UniProtKB/Swiss-Prot annotation:
Belongs to the class-I aminoacyl-tRNA synthetase family. MetG type 1 subfamily. Zn(2+) binds at C146, C149, C159, C162. The gene is metG. GO terms for molecular function: ATP binding; metal ion binding; methionine-tRNA ligase activity; tRNA binding. Homodimer. It holds the Pfam family tRNA_bind. InterPro entries: aa-tRNA-synth_I_CS (IPR001412), Anticodon_Met (IPR041872), Met-tRNA-synth_bsu_C (IPR004495), Met-tRNA_ligase_1 (IPR023458), Met-tRNA_synth (IPR014758), Methionyl/Leucyl_tRNA_Synth (IPR015413), MetRS_core (IPR033911), MetRS_Zn (IPR029038). Keywords: Aminoacyl-tRNA synthetase, ATP-binding, Cytoplasm, Ligase, Metal-binding, Nucleotide-binding, Protein biosynthesis, RNA-binding, tRNA-binding, Zinc. It catalyses: tRNA(Met) + L-methionine + ATP = L-methionyl-tRNA(Met) + AMP + diphosphate. Its cofactor is Zn(2+). This is Methionine--tRNA ligase.
Amino acid sequence: MSTNSRQILVTCALPYANGPIHLGHMLEHIQADIWVRFQRMRGNEIYFVCADDAHGTPIMLKADQMGVKPEQLIADVQQKHMADFSGFNISFDNYHSTHSDENRELVEAIYHKLKQNGFIKTRIISQLFDPEKAMFLPDRFVKGTCPKCKAEDQYGDNCEVCSATYSPIELISPRSTVSGATPVLKESEHFFFDLPAFESMLTEWIRSGSLQQEVANKMQEWFEAGLQQWDISRDAPYFGFKIPNTDNKYFYVWLDAPIGYMASFKNLCGKKSGIDFDSFWSKESHAELYHFIGKDIMYFHSLFWPAMLDGASLRKPNNIFVHGYVTVNGEKMSKSRGTFIQAATYLKYLDPECLRYYYAAKLGSRIDDLDLNLDDFVQRVNTDLVNKLVNLASRNASFIQKRFDGKLADKLDDKMLFDEFIAQSELIADYYENREFGKAIREIMALTDKANKYVDEKAPWVIAKDESRTDELQQVCSMGIELFRVLIGYLKPVLPNLAARAEAFLNTQLTWENVASPLLDHQIAPFKPLFSRLDMKKIEEMIEASKIENAKANQTAGKSAVENKAFSEFEPIEESITIDDFFKVDLRVAKVLKCEAVPESNKLLKFILDIGNETRQVFSGIKAAYGKPEDLEGRFVIMVANLAPRKMKFGMSEGMILSAGNGGADLYLLDVDAGAKAGQRVK
């Protein structure tokens, strides 16, 4: 390791230990892995750790539903997670669990430090309590009628129709989603972290200029709304770590989860000599610390986590790198359409490096959603990697092997072209460093086109027919292989398996530093196929397999729901109504003329609808399900046309758009068959 190398610790968000890894998860882990592999190629001392997030009410309830102990559930899930990450070549130095001795010790130590420094407060709060299950109910395990807009079946913390936020005790007609019972109000002493005490420090962190602008802007919004003390405790029964010196209080999962980063690294330090835990986590640390996370957990990582570290006299992250969501063919991943694809399912049908390349080609440093367009996926992989990159090696290697026994020429045929390729090294490195992977890929593929143009113009297949041009043939084909070597070196962080096969063929190891050193008078190995074409049939098979797997999962959930209503996918049928009651509801086919996000709301989309003889403005709380509202323009929806207009903060809503699902990202707009027209009544 160079004496000038950087010391870096990188983490990914911890996958929750109650379900499988899917292609949405893989975006983050691939993004982080590419960055880590690049840093290794640059000679930096870097460690890459992660763990399963293994505590909380959902895990406790799912284990109970399955008839196993939570410890068994999380152990089984962890093995599957690790297999998925290994299959996608995610090169963790350590993968651990938050349910570990290291994490318990660190959680208790940080808690004691926060308490000692005066940042832990206690007070009595009133909570909803399930009398049948004898448990306090987290916000998301209570449903009822919104106290603001009177929308039914809303969660205990916010309304997905009007975007109002409220306390669970404000819900009208609340019910427990665990047992179906009507909860009662019960008092309990809770422990709070004094987040407002850190507003000055967090404001200064924003102004450092290192955070993504979108993150800094969002943090500023939270400051303007006012920071609140954070409840870090939960009452028994709960699966997690007990708060010291209490009888029935546990640390909230979001307190111990980020500390899991530290625990995984501490576990690594115990297994590998020469790594000093404190040199990475002490207040005086000069090491770099980066967290790769999704935008859905930005709140915890940009506010609570740095404040908690600062309050415990530990170092803060240098940065948090936030990414967007994955959509498939322009829509959110769908279980019914088979585009909710588990990592394990993908690995049964396709090469993981295809997805690594495609994600890299579309990733930038902003918090933008990434669309996995399956047609474009096939075309881009086959064009870039097979037709251009790998073909560059194969079309030259055959001549070198047959005519020159695998020996490359002792000089470059076109040194200016070689120097041009090497001159791009630092630009490409800069793109990698700043997570502008898409720009790096575009630069590399532009060089690939130049390399193929060189071979096309030199036409070695023509030169080979002239015995007097033997030396020229060796130099031209060697030059083609040299350019291939440089390109593979640049792509090694993205395509480690392809790079390993190329290294075996080239009979050399590729580092960022030695890319500039040509292989003159060098022996290469016989060429073997390096990469296979993507077949759309295999993708179609994968989609069908996903549909079947998702259907089986739903069936299993349905059976379990008989025993435990918390995991029921379907709500009970409402009380019967008369036909006259039904006819009072005027349902109409509506065409979406315009759709846009409401900037001030996390839930709402604003629609302008054509209902035949007039247009209507309607607000709908489906933003989480449809991340690209403009894609909805031109399609038909079903709306309640005779619902009384409701004045909202953002304007008048003149109806309601119908959708099915459980809320949040799990919502699906109702559609009509071809031929239906705007304004027609649904009967």
